[in-house]
Amino acid sequence: MAASAQQVQGAQAQGAVVTVSAAASLGDAMREVAQRFERQHTGVRVRLNVAASGVLVQQMAQGAPVDVLVSADAATMDRAQRERLVDASTRRVIAGNALVLAVPNAPDHTGVVPVRSLNDLGTPQVRRVAIGKPATVPAGLHAREALEAAGLWATVAPRIVPADSVRQVLDYLARGEVDAGFVYRTDAAAQPARVRVVQVVPTARPVMYPAAVAQQAPQPALAREFLRFLLSEPAQAVLRDRGFAPAVP
């Protein structure tokens, strides 16, 4: 996976742009990582595209120029591999996370609908539950599977407020527009004054963030260098500081 130093230096001299498509829940962390990468690679600019993982793969399939893909689950990266959108030999897990059930924490909403656990979502008082769209948002798929495993999906499904990304769920919670919602632990930590975690939700599969170089990367050498940087201590420190679990070797 190592990029040629000569290729990287050539890209720097040309003022190259490396395009990174990253899952929405990684947005804030990836912006900081991108800044650190740019400081270490003078002349290179990172263009960050943040959206739901499924949307990112759709964009690639439609021909969007991407150098590195970072998804929020293995299944989405598996799909990208099947469609030959990424180089499977470069695939690495860069971080982990946890799914949580959260509620609004603003004073004017606290206590209106008592939600203390997953089971409370089945009570009549709970009318609006935000989750990411399971077809494109990995956190939404994790949430649906957790509700199904708890025998709550049939009850909760009519109350669901669908979201285009996990960050949109967070916005709904922060504004008190829903009674509860499923986000990642790191998302809830970004809004401690407005969002409160009530339960870490067991998931059928670990929440992992795989990354890979795009098969048609416009800047393949820089793409490999950026992926290497994601696994380096400076980038991992950023991810740890924002609550992500360590990368898996």
Give the residues covered by each predicted segment.
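Exported/periplasmic ABC-transporter solute-binding proteins
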Residues: S4-H41, R45-G54, Q58-Q62, S71-A74, ...
